[in-house]
C-alpha cells in the first residue's frame, strides 16, 4: 500500500546525534482515489500484514518446537521412564501440526501443489493484500468482509497456539524436569 499523503517528519539518529526533517507526501494528481480511499487502503493492508506477521512468527516457533519434540522422542525412545512424556510430546506435535497446516500450506513442493492441496489462511490473506498493489482505491465492503472472516479464522488458530505455548509446553517442561532427564544427549 502507498503511504497516505500528508505531512511527516523523518528522523535520523547516529550515535548521540539526531537530525529531523519535515516533509510532505503529495497525492498523485492523476489518481482518481481520494485521500480517504488511500488511507483506508493503507489501514486495510497494514492490518492484514500485522496478522500475517503474527501467524508467520507462530509458524516459525511451531517448526522449532516440532524439531525439538521430534529430537526428544528420538533421544528417549528406549527410555521406559520417558514413555508418558513421549506420548505427551506426540499430542503436542499433533496439535501444533494441525495449527500450522491451517495457517500455511506445508505440502507445497512444486508450482502445481497449490492446486493439488489448496491455499491456507495466510496465503488467502496475502492474496487479498496483493489486490491492492495498484491503484489508490479503498477496500470494498466485500474486501472488508473477507478480510475480517480470514482474520477471525487466523485468530482462532493463534489462540490455540497461544494456549499450547502457555499451558502444554510449560507442563511438558515441568514433567521433563521431574523425570530428571538429561537435556543434551551425546552419543559416541
Where are the regions a protein language model picked out?
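Low-complexity, Pro/Ser/Thr- and charge-rich linker/hinge segments at domain boundaries
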Residues: 20-54
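Short, surface-exposed loop/turn motifs with a glycine/proline- and acidic-biased composition
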Residues: 1-5
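Mature extracytoplasmic or organellar-lumen-exposed domains after removal of signal/transit peptides
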Residues: 7, 14, 21-23, 27, ...
Amino acid at each position: 500500500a502507498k503511504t497516505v499523503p500528508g505531512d511527516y517528519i523523518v528522523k535520523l539518529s547516529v550515535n548521540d546525534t539526531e537530525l529531523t526533517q519535515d516533509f510532505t507526501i503529495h497525492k498523485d494528481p492523476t489518481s482518481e482515489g481520494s485521500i480517504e480511499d488511500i488511507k483506508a487502503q493503507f489501514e486495510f493492508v497494514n492490518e492484514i500484514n500485522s496478522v500475517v506477521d503474527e501467524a508467520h512468527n507462530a509458524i516459525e516457533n511451531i517448526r522449532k518446537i516440532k524439531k525439538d519434540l521430534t529430537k526428544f522422542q528420538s533421544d528417549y525412545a528406549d527410555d521406559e521412564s520417558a514413555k508418558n512424556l513421549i506420548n505427551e510430546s506426540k499430542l503436542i506435535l499433533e496439535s501444533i501440526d494441525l495449527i500450522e497446516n491451517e495457517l500455511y500450506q506445508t505440502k507445497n513442493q512444486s508450482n502445481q501443489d497449490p492446486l493439488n492441496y489448496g491455499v491456507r489462511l495466510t496465503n488467502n490473506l496475502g492474496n487479498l493484500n496483493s489486490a491492492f498493489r495498484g491503484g489508490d482505491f479503498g477496500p470494498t465492503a466485500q474486501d472488508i468482509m473477507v478480510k475480517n472472516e480470514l482474520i477471525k479464522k487466523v485468530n482462532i488458530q493463534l489462540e490455540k497456539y497461544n494456549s499450547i505455548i502457555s499451558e502444554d509446553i510449560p507442563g511438558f517442561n515441568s514433567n521433563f524436569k521431574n523425570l530428571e532427564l538429561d537435556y543434551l544427549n551425546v552419543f559416541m
